[in-house]
């Protein structure tokens, strides 16, 4: 029961900066599982051999996974807490002008796709004008 409470507390905390790593790992495992199931389904005459090998592999892999599955999550939480501490230290020591500059850079980056879209939409009209200038009024 105490383990369930610890698991719920650990899941509730979440990762502040490295949550994407956990999401990417979940996505990779799901994709690999789907590819494996597809390959197993399409193995044709090799299907009985795949089924025979799959049993012993599961008998070895499942206990190992159950024994060591907490390690990557704990390591990821440790690294995330280290990143949080580093960001806090850096945030305290940076002068305000650097913080303002980084905010301006982020806003410029966020505005870049819209600027590119507007530029791309205006290009066809400009190329027609240039074609008329170079090739005459036809």
Swiss-Prot record:
Keywords: Acetylation, Allergen, Cytoplasm. Its main location: cytoplasm. It holds the Pfam family REF. The keyword Cytoplasm applies. Localized in all laticifer layers. InterPro entries: REF (IPR008802). It is found in: Cytoplasm. The keyword Glycoprotein does not apply. GO terms for cellular component: cytoplasm. Induction: Induced by tapping. Not induced by wounding, ethephon or abscisic acid treatment. Induced by ethephon or ethylene. It comes from the Eukaryota. Not glycosylated. The modification N-acetylalanine is found at residue 2. In solution, able to form amyloid fibers and aggregates rich in beta-sheets. Interaction with membrane stabilizes the protein, inhibiting the amyloid state and aggregation. May be part of the rubber biosynthesis machinery. Plays a role in rubber elongation. Belongs to the REF/SRPP family. This is Rubber elongation factor protein. It comes from Hevea brasiliensis (Para rubber tree). The lineage of its organism: Eukaryota, Viridiplantae, Streptophyta, Embryophyta, Tracheophyta.
